[in-house]
Amino acid sequence: MLIVLVSWFYIFITLLNFGYLGRLFFKNSFAVNKLIHLVLGLITLMFIGHIWAFFSGFNANFHFFLLFVNLLISLIYRKEIIIYIKDILKAVIKIKLKSKILLLVIFFLVLAKSASLGSRLDNENYYIQSIQWLNEYGFFKGLGNLHLYFCQTSGWHVLQSIFSFDFTDFAFNDLGSFMLLLFNIYAIITYQSKYGSSLLLIGLPVLNFILLEFTIVPSPDFGIIMIFLVVVHLFLKNFAQPDSNTFYLIFLLSLSAMLIKVTGIGLFVFPIILLYKIRNKSLRFWLKLLSTSLIFVSIWIGKNLIISGYPFFPSDYFSEYFNIKHQVPKELFDFSLRKDMLYEFFATPEEVNNLSYFELFWKWLTRSKVSFIFNVSLILYVLIIPLWIIRFKNKPAYWYIYLSFIGQLIFLAITSPQYRFAIQYLFIFSLMIFIFHIGKKTKFLLFSFSQLIVLYFILYPLRYDKISSTNFHLNPSVFRVQNLIYPAPNSSISSKYEIINMGNLKYYTPVKNVYFWSNGDCKLPCLNDRQLHYFKHYFNYIPQLIDNDNLSKGLYSKKLNKKNIK
């Protein structure tokens, strides 16, 4: 916990500094509160991190650069930084004693959870390894040829890579938990000082027991949830009289969400609506909007082309115009992203092709205990929220949020209908009901009760084998005494690794029998041998070095002759 606390302090100073840099870089006078200033710093750092990753990894050179920029901004904005910190301290001192105690409890619970071991399959499949590749090489040419999931390299992983401090002996994985703590601090302070329909974020502490399960690993889903909460907060607060500065901030946040994960596409409903409402849009306004869009789209396409060879990954649109050696072969791309494989998490390809729509719907609904809870919640909210809006909040802004929700569900239905890609809407609608229908004293009691649930899950972690349908399960993350000082490892896989040669590629593979897609935490390049031999046997492809003697030159998929396959 102590080591994590030190990393949190550095993250705070960096985001604070880059918030000022973001205002300067995007040339806008954002009227933002203390929390959104730090979120602006986060997306500014993510933007700069993407630019850096085109040329190098987040190694010692980057951290010298980051330290230099931090020192420079701290000198230039030293007065503003001092005022910022004083304002935060004054706000904390001003709140009531019971709120201070609650805030202190939340602080230690989030810190303890952050120092614990994370146990998620996606973390073992590609989160850990994606961050390691970013640390070592930045955006790596043809990385998707080694593991199809690496094509998803997220902006959230870029950020976590920056703060993983790979040159140390510790396993840092704490950005998500730190951002959750910031949101909680804002919520508790605002809970007493301001109370209005636009301040939905004050209800956030009641969701800590769920949100912490997203932050214990570097899940891009938490990045989407965080940005979504901020965007809806700004949208409701400024809907009646939007200005170009607020619109531009919401637009930046929406673009940033797309760099994190394409499931953030539903966010674009909000800037589109505000764009229509803003009057007197100047030529300068349109040029700024267009140039910002081109920069972000260019970064997104460039990253995709380097890693997978598909400009609009996870779509294969226009990929035929890019005849590049390191492009993931179409057969492997289709294996991972064709419709029956996108539904594989709840049905086999045969079931997708043979079952009726109702039978598929039922399998999706009842896939597991946790899926059943969230899937039923999504369906209920589709039916209940319109009635709630009509009865209590019959205003256009709330209907637009619901429209975004329906659009997101339609998008997921034709791509990958997993509840976690729409869970942000469950959170925001739950917060609306919580804020508008629960009394202030009852709110505080629920805040406190929610932290008891967090404490219980720290001491007795969720056993996902009891609520999940996945055939492979990891040991639950348990807080240990040594975690008071040192953070737990990033990986739950306790396996030795052996070196295997396949053609000109030398790779590490776990000796222990692990999940088909999982790699764990080991030296690069790392690949589950079962996975390699599966694609070799069924598709006649193996990953190979572009340059026989230099891994840094990239990877491609080599087509084998059937007679050479053993």
Write out the residue ranges for each language-model feature:
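Membrane-embedded, hydrophobic transmembrane alpha-helices
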Residues: M1-L89
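Hydrophobic, aromatic-rich transmembrane alpha-helices
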Residues: N17-L24, S177-S193, N353-K395
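Membrane-interface alpha helices of multi-pass inner-membrane proteins
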Residues: I48-A53, L212-E213, T246-I273, T292-I295, ...
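Hydrophobic alpha-helical membrane-interfacial segments at the cytosolic entry of transmembrane helices
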Residues: K96-L109, I278-L305, F449-L455
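Membrane-lumen/periplasm interface segments of specific transmembrane helices
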Residues: A115-G118, L287-W364
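Intrinsically disordered, polar/acidic, low-complexity terminal segments
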Residues: Y321-T348, S450-K566
